[in-house]
Amino acid sequence: DIKHANRLGCTVIRVIVNTPPEIMAKAAPYAEQYNVRLGLEIHAPFNFEHEWIQRHLDTVYKVDRPYLGIVPDMGIFEKRFPRVRSNRYIRRGAHPLIVQYISEVYARHEGFDRLLEDVKKMRANELDLAMANDIQHMTYVTPRRLLDYMPIIFHIHAKFNEMLED
């Protein structure tokens, strides 16, 4: 992949999160040889504090080569559950009050441990439970955390469900 990226003129490869840090370390000299930086994607439900990501960050700093870094996925900075996704659940048959409850739990960034149990008590249907499971795979990190990692951020990965003024 590194060689192909170089031949295509690409200088950054987004490495998926399940790649072991040891593989990244071993690939660093090869990446340097081909002038292709390897950036581990930090994607929800992972975040900068997750043990697996910490192992990668330790490797990046230990190897200390300019060809190892990170590619944060902007999904880890979702402050609220996107309305377009909530509305899709409702259109497909989820209960509006349960959708609202789940969205409020996510907005507080706490209570995830009891969410599924609480939603089941609300006589949830399959779609309500799917949404409750959906947010279990989301995370919120303050965007200010990017400042801590600026020297090793090679690129970002993003999709936009919606954008609000704040």
Descriptions of predicted regions:
Residues 1-119:
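Active-site acidic/histidine proton-transfer and metal-coordination neighborhood
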